[in-house]
């Protein structure tokens, strides 16, 4: 495919995730601080006679390239809303670099990347908030992934707002996954129902993040004990924060310096060649 358009599905992490209540509709009220890493899946697209999707990359196996894929659903939704004259058919290639069912956005990041690609090239009048409102209902975290910038999420995670004075762009981060998928639904279902209090993040974000938590970590450990091993190993490599993201199994560590992050990655790569590792910085 001769690609003329390109976007990145930035990896999402939950720097903290407080579960506050189980709702009558089966969903949960949460408070979370979303952040994004400067790496992820890539989407390339070119004008075509009809929509097509090809998926390649390390984590392509088992993914559907049919109309049920979120990438094509976003394309179809925007075309239905704005017309085929404004949103033409595209041949799309999705390169999967992020593990699946891993707590770092994955399909939501890809859907948001497709939405941004269409916006950039065909619907430039759409702002992030409008785009998120349109495509957000297609899946959890898509609304946050549209802008892919640090923000607080509440409700089911789709009520988004900025945190005044929070400047964490450029913080070195290391992502680690044991290559074991963890389904989100069962982890939320196994939450113990105890509200352990709200999430507050202000300008003293380091101390506040250290004092925060991921309430899904305990139920995720039951599904994937390797999470405990990862957190123990990360903690020994002296980050200022190590925590599980989302419903797992990916864990992250934040460091003071890129050299410390890179040294930690080298240690883990040597000790655990089967683990997936990605070094980057927060956007």
UniProtKB/Swiss-Prot annotation:
A Gene Ontology biological process term: terpenoid biosynthetic process
Keyword Transferase belongs to the record: yes
Record's catalysed reaction(s): 4-CDP-2-C-methyl-D-erythritol + ATP = 4-CDP-2-C-methyl-D-erythritol 2-phosphate + ADP + H(+)
Active site as annotated: 12, 141
Pathway entry: Isoprenoid biosynthesis; isopentenyl diphosphate biosynthesis via DXP pathway; isopentenyl diphosphate from 1-deoxy-D-xylulose 5-phosphate: step 3/6
SUPFAM superfamilies: GHMP Kinase, C-terminal domain, Ribosomal protein S5 domain 2-like
EC identifiers of the protein: 2.7.1.148
InterPro entries tied to this protein: GHMP_kinase_C_dom, GHMP_kinase_C_sf, GHMP_kinase_N_dom, IspE, Ribosomal_Su5_D2-typ_SF, Ribsml_uS5_D2-typ_fold_subgr
Gene Ontology molecular function terms on file: 4-(cytidine 5'-diphospho)-2-C-methyl-D-erythritol kinase activity; ATP binding
Keywords of the record: ATP-binding, Isoprene biosynthesis, Kinase, Nucleotide-binding, Transferase
Binding site for ATP: 99-109
Entry keyword annotation includes ATP-binding: yes
UniProt cross-references to PANTHER family, sorted A to Z: 4-DIPHOSPHOCYTIDYL-2-C-METHYL-D-ERYTHRITOL KINASE, CHLOROPLASTIC (PTHR43527:SF2)
Functional description taken from the UniProt entry: Catalyzes the phosphorylation of the position 2 hydroxy group of 4-diphosphocytidyl-2C-methyl-D-erythritol.
Family as reported in the entry's similarity comment: Belongs to the GHMP kinase family. IspE subfamily.
Protein name stated in the entry: 4-diphosphocytidyl-2-C-methyl-D-erythritol kinase
Organism encoding this protein: Sphingopyxis alaskensis (strain DSM 13593 / LMG 18877 / RB2256) (Sphingomonas alaskensis)
């Amino acid at each position: 495919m001769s690609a003329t358009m390109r976007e990145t599905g930035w990896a999402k992490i939950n720097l903290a995730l407080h579960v506050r209540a189980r709702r009558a509709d089966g969903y949960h009220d949460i408070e979370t601080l979303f952040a994004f890493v400067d790496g992820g899946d890539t989407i390339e697209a070119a004008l075509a006679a009809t929509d097509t999707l090809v998926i390649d990359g390390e984590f392509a196996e088992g993914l559907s390239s049919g109309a049920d894929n979120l990438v094509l659903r976003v394309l179809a939704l925007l075309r239905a809303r704005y017309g085929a004259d404004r949103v033409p058919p595209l041949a799309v290639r999705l390169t999967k670099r992020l593990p699946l069912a891993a707590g770092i956005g994955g399909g939501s990041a890809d859907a948001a990347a497709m939405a941004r690609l269409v916006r950039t090239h065909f619907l430039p009048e759409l702002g992030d908030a409008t785009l998120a409102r349109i495509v957000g209902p297609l899946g959890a975290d898509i609304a946050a992934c549209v802008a892919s910038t640090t923000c607080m999420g509440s409700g089911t995670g789709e009520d988004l707002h900025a945190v005044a004075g929070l400047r964490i762009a450029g913080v070195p981060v290391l992502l680690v996954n044991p290559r074991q998928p963890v389904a989100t639904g069962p982890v939320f279902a196994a939450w113990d129902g105890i509200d352990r209090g709200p999430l507050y993040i202000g300008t003293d974000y380091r101390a506040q993040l250290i004092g925060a938590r991921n309430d899904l970590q305990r139920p995720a450990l039951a599904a994937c004990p390797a999470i405990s091993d990862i957190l123990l190993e990360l903690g020994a490599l002296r980050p200022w924060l190590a925590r599980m993201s989302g419903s797992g199994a990916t864990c992250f560590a934040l460091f003071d310096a890129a050299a410390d992050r890179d040294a930690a990655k080298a240690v883990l790569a040597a000790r655990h060649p089967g683990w997936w590792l990605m070094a980057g910085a927060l956007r």
